[in-house]
UniProtKB/Swiss-Prot annotation:
Sequence repeats lie at residues 36-350, 365-710, 711-1069, 1079-1417. Residues 36-1417 are annotated as: 4 X 308-326 AA approximate repeats. One of its GO terms (molecular function) is lysophospholipase activity. PANTHER family: PHOSPHOLIPASE B, PLB1 (PTHR21325), PHOSPHOLIPASE B1, MEMBRANE-ASSOCIATED (PTHR21325:SF52). InterPro entries: GDSL, Lipase_GDSL_AS, Phospholipase_B, PLB1, SGNH_hydro_sf. This is Phospholipase B1, membrane-associated. Glycans are attached at N185, N436, N532, N593, N711, N813, N892, N1070, N1129, N1206, N1393. One of its GO terms (biological process) is phospholipid metabolic process. Disulfide bonds: none annotated. Calcium-independent membrane-associated phospholipase that catalyzes complete diacylation of phospholipids by hydrolyzing both sn-1 and sn-2 fatty acyl chains attached to the glycerol backbone (phospholipase B activity). Has dual phospholipase and lysophospholipase activities toward diacylphospholipids. Preferentially cleaves sn-2 ester bonds over sn-1 bonds. Acts as a lipase toward glycerolipid substrates. Hydrolyzes fatty acyl chains of diacylglycerols with preference for the sn-2 position and of triacylglycerols with not positional selectivity. The gene is PLB1. It comes from Monodelphis domestica. Residues 1-22 form the signal peptide.
Length: 1474
């Protein structure tokens, strides 16, 4: 027997705990012997080198050898973190006690080297450790520890030296939540600790107390389990301000600094026999730094050892000079006492405590300036080109970025570290507007000298949401990932502000980001790659470029951040290094000249180079009123120095990280000067030590410099490069005004009334490959959402033709469109929620997400705004149709589409939905196969297997063409049903322009210039035509809409007419939906590929294909004899129309009559046994009898066996037989009149007896047992035309009152009948033979009465007696039974779906060509046959129930495993069609 690893680990853990645990005294405290794994710890100290001396009388000359006992108070819990792996968090909580023991064991073992007689360590017992221990909980532990030491006979309490460690977690304490708190303030939690220390000082003589802050222990444990570092203190303490790394670092520093100040004050040094030392766990640590041989030991043990080593070193090192930081890969050295310093360091005996006097900070007076230029006037006329923009033309200023733009600490007084949390936005270099230029130098104040009416600048203090921040939307602690959302908010603020003329005012926006990305880059290199960095910037710029007219964007490149190390490493400067390390670990934690530092420096350069490349691409110079100019003055900025050559901290806030107002002023000067320097000649190195003069625009060049007015050519451009194609359009409409009064009807909706645009669908709508270069196949995965025909909003209509850009010509305040590139989750995707590779099945999720976004977005008035939503789906379903014709059937496609549209209809007010007919995949088959030298032929299978890999003129291709037509028909039927025209403010309009696509040809070959490199996705050239066709379709009346798209046509954009100014709907088109065509018959279309029988007749029922069935038969009552199935009036309603019977009828063909035999005849035309007509002589093997009950089943079974044996057409031994049993309705209907005769027990026993006969007499048999339906629904069926009433034909259900106990009892009995028939099929006896199977088919388990359009029972499914089924009902039962047979046991549909469709018949698949049984469904293992004695029926039920439960569990496991396999598959959008 093999022991599972998890069980082995548990066993060893229990063994270890049992072995090491012992007790002292009253079991309140626990000791631990030395763990085996730590005995080989490389301890370097040599006690014999320290001269012997008698025990010390003073704690300030205490040696290690003097310590007699080691104890601990508190626990080593970690602060829970929402992102921490839950299992690991729980494991840590369970092992807090063990951690304390391990830490104290290591420490005790160190001490034993010097003091062999030291007593066993003391830790609180498990019972005393609370799961969330706070400082106030430590008091009882302290008192118990003192009592234990007093009672311990091995310890001289008055004279022996004691080492007591008080563990607490500063991170779990509530620090001040605002910078208004003074540093000296103590929280109540700190006061609790002080009371504890006061108690120890009073009660415990001769004690050295370590106050151990283990905050970073939790962070070290969590560092391997989360991305964003330690849990923020604001979250723990519920502080109102937003959590940030800066807040966490500053507040933790505040707490630790407060303790240091208190302890160095001498409060606990009033006696020579007692002292308290503050010890902080090492800031960052990995297992690799532990001086332990790397074995399979737990990381928790390693962390415990690290904490012990940290404590040891803290006692040996001079206080205030402790080693605070170890880098990745650096091992922690174990410090040793020396002859010169053999004692434990205290605050009193530390002659190094008084640090080197701080270098005096240079004056921090704010720097004003002045600017006197000869020409400070605006242009004579408001310029239309950004390349002719004077400073005085700027009317609006904005900024994006991080805390350097937010102004954190810019106005803080020296030493006030808490105040660094304050965001002095009014002093910010790029947008601050405090006072004026004479006292505060900022870009905004400089521009105000040219235009005093400038708006947008920030003043005072506050975060980005404060009113004073205005258009300074920088977020403290931000990385480049947040830029798109910042840009989005900035645009919205500019649009909403009434003081800003959004269309006409010239705006300047400064963007500066990257420091925090670099500071975190080593923790997640892929996340902070240069590619991602510039991609995030690109997305933000895309938003500005797409939406904001008249903008000059300053893109300031990231500074060279490595110079920060100079400030950190200079010991003479009093910087809070704990804060610096927390804020920027990747810059500070590595050694000089290390590989890691070199990597950081290289990444810094890549950030700068990639930013240059982004701007040099010219992608933001496609309009005359927009440009992005790179301002590189910070790229090589050196650390400013004092006259003594030391880093000048006066340029920095008290945290030595953020800029002080002095630096802000110098940087503002440099930015201004950079803006007036020609592109290509801008300064990249600015020495902040020097106060530079502000330059003026020259007479010859009075403009802010751009690439064009600098006569600059981007390096990436080549003289021979062809000009970028123009895909814009002209709109010549005169009337672009909205309705005179806000419309309330969707049928009176003008284009200018549309305020919101949205889209859902697949990769065509997501924009895959639209902007890809012809030879760049991998780029097809890029989602160019801003160029998408129905939802893109890049640039304007002049250069990019999309539906939103057309609508923006009518309403410039349109919202919802996407810009740039990215996934549906990106902010710039907005309401383009299309997902690449999406199928109809996932459409409802898309519309749910869309609606949620519309409801929650402040830019959208969900109830009032008019919306246009465009939906296109279906191509991907068709491309996968041949892989599973059941899953991708037209019926399922229609159902999924209906669910999504129903949701929109139900949830969204004021909406016009464009339902665009999908693009026929036959089109790109032509393109793909016609350009085999240009298209990726090797990817044909993954791109669209069902169409690209089949032969021309093959049956498979013909079948696919038919399926395409059925899909299109389903879409049209759905819209024309009128179900979405029940409200005045909602409609769905079918836009059919893609029904037929005329390709462009070159030399007789389809022109690939309209397609992306995969020859599948349309490129921008194609999308432009799609946009024009969609728009024109929207203006064409129903019944006259263009149903084709000519890619070669020079399509112009239509305009609403004066007579018809509205977007066209069925009503304003005076259109009447065509009446549904009369249904000629209830037949079905057979769309399954040709599938023959097995190569040889199978010997196993678990490998039985439909074509293997030679004989069909049935048992049952009047529902199987088909009483009334073909009746047209009361005169013949009692006739048995056996030829139409769902399970055994064989009249006509499948195309005219849907029955199980007619389906089977498509696989085997030589099928025997089915019944025809109405005469009993033609009943075949239909032995059902009208009025039969379960007790009749054994006799029917006997009759059937005899008929088979006597038939000359049947080879009893060799022919495979399919028998369907359906009985029980009469038993239920008569149950209340004779419960004993019609009991569940009798019902099940009768079924078992019939099955036993078949099992004994019939070889090669597959038995369908159909669960009885829920008869309570029959009560709904009533009408004047009904020949009989439910009361008379089924009294037990018809006579009971609604909600009566009698009716409820009958419902229960009904369920028991279902359960009984289901469980009996699990009898082990029926699983013993390889050629016999009984399978329950549960499609009636939850019976749904079909309803008509008015919500009443649809009597077309019932015969004239309103009880038996009509031919339509029999057809639906046949389809449900057949489909059940092709569904795995445990996954069968358990309800009837009686909706008409000729394509609902499922097909066997190549993966699953057999009828499903228990075994081939994966629920049973193949076992050797063996005989078992007969058992009582109720024992069978118990066994069957157990088997059923096991089966359900197995199914769940199988499905989970299957789903997990699906999830593990890599996603390749290149290999995903639409």
């Amino acid at each position: 027997m093999r022991l599972q690893p998890s069980l082995l680990l548990l066993a060893l853990l229990l063994l270890k705990v049992t072995t090491i645990q012992a007790t002292l005294g009253n079991n309140s405290w626990e000791e631990q012997t030395w763990p085996e794994g730590l005995k080989n710890f490389p301890f370097p100290c040599r006690p014999e080198e320290i001269p012997f001396s008698p025990p010390s009388e003073s704690v300030h000359s205490l040696r290690i050898s003097d310590i007699r006992v080691v104890g601990a108070i508190g626990n080593l819990e970690t602060t829970p973190d929402a992102k921490m792996v839950l299992k690991r968090q729980k494991w840590i909580e369970r092992n807090q006690m063990q951690t304390c023991m391990q830490v104290m064991t290591v420490l005790s073992d160190f001490i034993k080297k010097f003091s062999p007689s030291v007593l066993p360590l003391l830790c609180p017992s498990r019972e005393k450790v609370l799961p969330r221990m706070r400082n106030e909980d430590l008091g009882p532990q302290a008192r118990e520890l003192v009592q234990h030491m007093k009672k311990n006979q091995k310890l001289n309490f008055r004279n022996d030296w004691k080492l007591i460690n008080v563990f607490f977690n500063a991170q779990s304490q509530c620090h001040p939540c605002s910078s208004s708190q003074k540093e000296g303030n103590m929280t109540s939690s700190m006061q609790e600790l002080i009371r504890l220390l006061d108690y120890l000082q009073k009660e415990v003589p001769k004690a050295f107390v370590n106050l151990v802050d283990i905050s970073e222990l939790g962070n070290s444990i969590q560092s391997n389990n989360q991305e964003n570092g330690p849990r923020d203190i604001n979250e723990v303490c519920e502080c109102p301000q937003e959590p940030s790394r800066l807040t966490t670092a500053v507040q933790r520093w505040y707490y630790q600094n407060s303790w240091e100040k208190l302890l160095t004050s001498g409060r606990y040094d009033t006696k020579d026999t007692f002292t308290v030392i503050y010890q902080s766990f090492l800031h960052e640590m990995e297992p690799s730094v532990f001086p332990i041989k790397q074995t399979s030991g737990s990381s928790l043990k390693k962390l415990s050892t690290a904490l012990a080593v940290s404590l040891w070193n803290g006692m040996i090192d001079p206080t205030g000079k402790k080693e605070e930081f170890f880098t990745t890969g650096q091992r922690i050295p174990v410090k040793c006492p020396t002859q010169k310093h053999p004692y434990l360091f205290t605050y009193r005996n530390n002659n190094k405590l008084s640090s080197t006097p701080e270098i005096k900070r240079i004056s921090e007076t704010r720097e004003g300036t002045e600017i006197r230029c000869p020409d400070m006037d605006p242009s004579n006329a408001v310029p239309t080109s950004v390349h002719h923009l004077r400073p005085a033309d700027i009317k609006v200023i904005g900024a994006l970025g991080d805390s350097l733009t937010a102004g954190n600490g810019a106005g803080s007084t020296p030493g006030n570290i808490l105040d660094v949390l304050t965001q002095y936005r009014g002093l910010s270099w790029s947008i601050g507007g405090n006072e004026n230029i004479s006292t505060v130098t900022t870009l905004a104040n400089i521009l105000r000298e040219f235009n005093p009416s400038l708006i947008g600048f920030s003043t005072g203090t506050g975060n980005q949401n404060s009113a004073a921040a205005f258009l300074n939307q920088a977020v403290a602690g931000a990385t480049s990932e947040t830029l798109p959302s910042q840009a989005r908010r900035l645009v919205d603020l500019m649009k909403e502000n009434k003081r800003i003329n959004f269309q006409d005012d010239w705006k300047i926006v400064t963007l500066f980001i990257g420091g925090n990305d670099l500071c975190d880059s080593c923790s997640d290199p892929p996340r902070y790659s240069s590619q991602n960095f510039t991609a995030h910037i690109g997305k933000a710029l895309d938003i500005l470029h797409a939406e904001v007219p008249r903008v000059f964007v300053n893109l300031v490149t990231v500074l060279s951040i490595v110079s920060l190390r100079e400030l950190y490493q200079e010991e003479s400067i009093n910087c809070p290094r704990v804060i610096l390390r927390s804020l920027c670990p990747c810059v500070l934690k590595f050694k000089d000249n290390s590989t890691e530092l070199t990597t950081l420096i290289e990444l810094n350069k890549q950030y700068q180079e990639e930013t240059h490349r982004l701007v040099d691409s010219g992608r933001y110079d496609t309009r005359d009123d927009f440009t992005v100019v790179l301002q590189p003055f910070l790229e090589q900025v050196p650390m400013p120095k004092t006259p003594e050559g030391l880093p000048d901290s006066s340029f920095f806030a008290p945290d030595c990280f953020h800029f002080h107002s002095k630096a802000h002023a110098r940087v503002a000067r440099s930015l201004w000067n950079n803006m007036l320097e020609p592109v290509g000649e801008k300064k990249k190195e600015e020495n902040l030590e020097n106060i530079v003069d502000l330059i003026c625009p020259s007479e010859s060049q009075p403009y802010l410099r751009t690439y064009k007015n600098s006569n600059y050519t981007y390096p990436t451009a080549t003289p021979t490069s062809s000009p970028k194609p123009d895909y814009g359009s002209q709109l010549w409409c005169e009337d672009r005004a909205p309705s005179a009064s806000f419309p309330t009807s969707v049928h009176a909706l003008k284009p200018a009334d549309i305020q919101v645009v949205a889209a859902v669908g697949d990769s065509l709508t997501a924009g895959n490959g639209i902007g890809s270069k012809p030879d760049d196949l991998p780029d097809v995965i890029t989602q160019y959402r801003g160029l998408s025909y129905s939802a893109g909003g890049d640039a304007s209509l002049e250069s990019v033709t999309t539906l939103p850009n057309i609508l923006r010509e009518f309403n410039m305040n349109l919202t919802g469109f996407a810009v740039g590139v990215g996934s549906a989750d990106d902010a710039n995707a907005f309401l383009n929620q299309a997902v690449p590779g999406a199928k109809a099945e996932g459409l409802k999720k898309q519309v749910q997400t869309l609606v949620q976004k519309m409801k929650s977005d402040p830019r959208i008035n969900f109830q009032r705004d008019w919306k246009v939503i465009t939906l296109l789906i279906g191509t991907t379903d068709l491309c996968d149709y041949c892989t599973d014709s059941n899953l991708y059937s037209a019926t399922n496609f229609s159902a999924y589409l209906r669910d999504a549209l129903d949701f929109l209809h139900r949830e969204v007010p004021r909406a016009l939905v464009n339902l665009v007919d999908f693009m026929n995949p036959i089109i790109f088959r032509q393109v793909f196969l016609g350009n085999q030298d240009k298209c990726p032929m090797t990817q044909a299978c993954s791109l669209c297997n069902c169409l690209l890999t089949v032969r021309e003129d093959s049956p498979e291709l013909a079948r696919m063409k038919e399926v395409v037509k059925v899909y299109q028909t389903k879409i049209r039927e759905l819209v024309e049903s009128g179900r979405y025209d029940t409200r005045e403010d909602f409609t769905i309009v079918l836009q059919p322009f893609l029904e037929e696509v005329k390709l462009a040809f070159q030399d007789g070959i389809p022109d690939v210039s309209f397609f992306a490199p995969d020859c599948i996705h349309p490129n921008q050239k194609f999308h432009s035509q799609l946009s024009r066709a969609l728009w024109n379709n929207m203006l064409q009346p129903l019944g006259k809409k263009m149903d084709f798209l000519d890619l070669t046509a020079d399509t112009t954009l239509s305009c609403p007419s004066l007579e018809e100014p509205f977007l066209r709907t069925y009503r304003n088109s005076n259109y009447t939906y065509p009446a549904n065509p009369a249904i000629e018959n209830w037949g079905s279309d057979f769309l399954c590929p040709e599938q023959g029988s097995s190569n040889s007749a199978p010997s196993s029922v678990h490998q039985l294909r439909p074509a293997d069935i030679k004989v069909v038969a049935a048992l049952g009552d009047s529902l199987t004899t088909a009483v009334g199935a073909g009746a047209k009036n009361n005169s013949n309603w009692s006739t048995a129309w056996r030829g139409l019977s769902w399970s055994i009828g064989g009249d006509g063909t499948l195309e005219t009559h849907t029955t199980l035999p007619n389906i089977l005849k498509k696989f085997n035309p030589h099928l025997h046994g089915f019944s025809t007509g109405t005469q009993e002589e033609a009943a075949g093997l239909n032995v059902a009898v009208e009025g039969a009950i379960a007790q009749d089943m054994p006799s029917q079974a006997r009759i059937l066996v005899d008929r088979m044996k006597n038939s000359s057409e049947i080879n009893l031994d060799q022919d495979w037989k399919l028998i369907t049993i359906f009985v029980g309705s009469n038993d239920l209907c008569q149950y209340c009149e004779n419960p004993e005769a019609h009991s569940v027990k009798n019902y099940v026993q009768s079924l078992q007896q019939a099955l036993d006969i078949f099992y004994k007499e019939l070889p090669r048999a597959f038995i369908n047992v159909v669960e009885i339906m829920e008869l309570v629904g029959l009560r709904q069926i009533q009408g004047e035309k009904c020949a009989v009433t439910t009361q008379s034909i089924c009294p037990c259900f018809g006579r009971s009152l609604d909600n009566s106990p009698e009716l409820q009892e009958m419902k229960n009995i009904n369920r028991h009948f279902q359960s009984g028939s289901s469980l009996i099929t699990y009898h082990h006896q029926y699983m013993e033979r390889e050629d016999f199977a009984v399978v329950v088919q549960p499609f009636f388990q939850s019976t749904v009465v079909p309803l008509d359009d008015k919500g009443k029972p649809d009597l077309s499914f019932f015969s004239v007696d309103c009880f038996h089924f009509s031919e339509r009902g029999h057809a639906e039962m046949a389809i449900a039974l057949w489909n059940n047979m092709l569904e795995p046991v445990g996954q069968k549909q358990t309800y009837n779906n009686f909706t008409h469709s000729r394509t609902k018949v499922k097909c066997p698949t190549s993966e699953n060509p057999y009828f499903f049984t228990m075994r081939n469904s994966g629920l049973l293992r193949k076992e050797a046959s063996h005989k078992t004695p007969s058992v009582p029926f109720w024992a069978v039920l118990v066994a069957a129930a157990a088997s059923f439960i096991v089966g359900v569990v197995l199914v769940m496991l199988w499905r989970t495993k299957k789903c997990s396999r699906r999830e593990e598959r890599p996603i390749s959008l290149v290999a995903t069609v639409f």
